[in-house]
């Protein structure tokens, strides 16, 4: 327990929390050619590689992912949710934060139904999460 005098001299410091989706915290100033701290909920990017990866033990699957070069010039790995997708190299995608627990290094999700990404076909429930229109 600190004394009053110690609190007057030093004060209390709040803990600094590290961002779970750091690439969304910066935008790029092309005039100055530098990154600027400017947090955003989503960000646009271009898919540079689309493929599958296998999850950590004890799970087994082929999870779809895309390597995305964001508009702030940072390259990240993003998960493609839902069954089936239409993404190819050079597709323009919108990403949000949110990790995939069994894929190491995947901290972002691609938003279905936005930009070049189509919604999931034939989806009846949880449609808003997968960008599917009402039939």
Swiss-Prot record:
Belongs to the universal ribosomal protein uS12 family. One of its GO terms (cellular component) is small ribosomal subunit. With S4 and S5 plays an important role in translational accuracy. This is Small ribosomal subunit protein uS12. GO terms for molecular function: rRNA binding; structural constituent of ribosome; tRNA binding. The keyword DNA-binding does not apply. Keywords: Methylation, Ribonucleoprotein, Ribosomal protein, RNA-binding, rRNA-binding, tRNA-binding. The modification 3-methylthioaspartic acid is found at residue 102. Residues 1-20 are annotated as: Disordered. Part of the 30S ribosomal subunit. Contacts proteins S8 and S17. May interact with IF1 in the 30S initiation complex. The gene is rpsL. One of its GO terms (biological process) is translation. Residues 9-18 have a biased composition (Basic residues). InterPro entries: NA-bd_OB-fold, Ribosomal_uS12, Ribosomal_uS12_bac.
